[in-house]
């Protein structure tokens, strides 16, 4: 193309990448000739090798890729990251390294990701892929967990305080027999009733903080925290909450309130209760956490967290870090939503 037009290769590059460096007539001539010759423009791979910039952000999540299409809160979060990337002229690469993926394959995916930095979404501190991300030596922002990772910025919420406020509300209605349906507490495949040992040492900070929030509220209300019935769900499936609700009620038929650490669990639990003739809230109080549109539409009592904003801020912190160069922790506000699914015990 340069030979055809009798110009330098720099001129060709400027026509595609820095049009302000050329006159409008010259750039139009370059583009028209390129189209006639079938030349699509500079090779992006070659350009990234030369500039050492990939022009993309890697979003690492220890979940199957389908999780971000099935879970509404996670979907909003990804949309937020995508918005910040789009506004700042960057691409977004999803790196899904869920439990079903072989460790070697997942490691290769992280090592081979052509990105300028990573947003790591809600993993435990000993997650093997987190260590691989850190070994890349690229900028990193963590979302939700792990907390307190040295030298790394984080965006999240105060999970303990948010869950404490919700539990205070439930206990204030008079409930004393409470079941708590949680997302997975560790990386290993386990679900069902949670024993005391596992309950005291969850690998995931978010679930641990939400459990502690309920315990603190129970203790303040004079209720033994050890009386809390906890059921763990490993997978995020439409029926997960219903399965967990069944297990909780079988373990303790005296339960009058089911608190859930995610709206997706609460909505599924409500479906199970309705199918079994248990009226909400007349016979059972149900609460969630996230504030997703489906939950709000069904009147769920829940905690709303700004998932979209969380994604946006994570992307912005990665792409436009503080001038100080020091890591920051941003704690976003939550809101207790008093819906139609909580009432006094029957």
Annotate each predicted stretch with a short phrase:
Residues 11, 56-59, 64-168, 172:
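Alpha-helical recognition/docking segments in bacterial nutrient-uptake
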């Amino acid at each position: 193309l340069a030979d055809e037009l009798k110009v330098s290769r720099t001129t060709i590059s400027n026509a595609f990448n820095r049009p302000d460096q050329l006159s409008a007539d010259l750039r139009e001539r370059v583009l028209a000739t390129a189209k006639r010759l079938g030349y699509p423009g500079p090779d992006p791979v070659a350009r990234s090798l030369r500039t050492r910039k990939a022009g993309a952000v890697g979003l690492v999540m220890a979940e199957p890729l389908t999780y971000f299409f099935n879970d509404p809160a996670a979907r909003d979060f990804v949309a937020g990251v995508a918005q910040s990337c789009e506004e700042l002229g960057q691409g977004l690469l999803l790196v899904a390294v869920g439990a079903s993926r072989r460790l070697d394959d997942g490691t290769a995916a992280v090592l081979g990701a052509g990105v300028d930095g990573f947003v790591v979404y809600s993993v435990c501190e000993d997650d093997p892929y987190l260590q691989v991300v850190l070994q890349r030596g690229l900028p990193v922002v963590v979302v939700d967990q792990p907390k307190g990772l040295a030298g790394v910025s984080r965006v999240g919420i105060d999970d303990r305080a948010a869950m404490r406020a919700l539990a205070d509300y439930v206990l204030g209605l008079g409930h004393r027999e409470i079941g708590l349906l949680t997302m997975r507490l560790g990386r290993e495949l386990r679900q069902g009733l949670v024993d005391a040992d596992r309950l005291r040492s969850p690998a995931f900070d978010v679930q641990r903080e939400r459990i502690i929030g309920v315990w603190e509220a129970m203790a303040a209300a004079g209720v033994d925290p050890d009386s809390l019935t906890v059921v763990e769900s490993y997978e995020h499936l439409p029926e997960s909450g219903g399965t967990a609700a069944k297990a909780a009620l079988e373990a303790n038929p005296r339960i009058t309130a089911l608190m859930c650490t995610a709206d997706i669990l609460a909505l599924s639990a409500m479906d199970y209760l309705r199918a079994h003739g248990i009226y909400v809230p007349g016979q059972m109080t149900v609460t969630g956490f996230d504030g997703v549109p489906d939950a709000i539409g069904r009147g769920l009592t829940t905690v709303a967290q700004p998932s979209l904003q969380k994604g946006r801020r994570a992307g912005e912190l990665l792409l436009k870090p503080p001038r100080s160069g020091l890591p920051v922790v941003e704690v976003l506000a939550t809101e207790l939503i008093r819906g139609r699914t909580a009432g006094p015990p029957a």
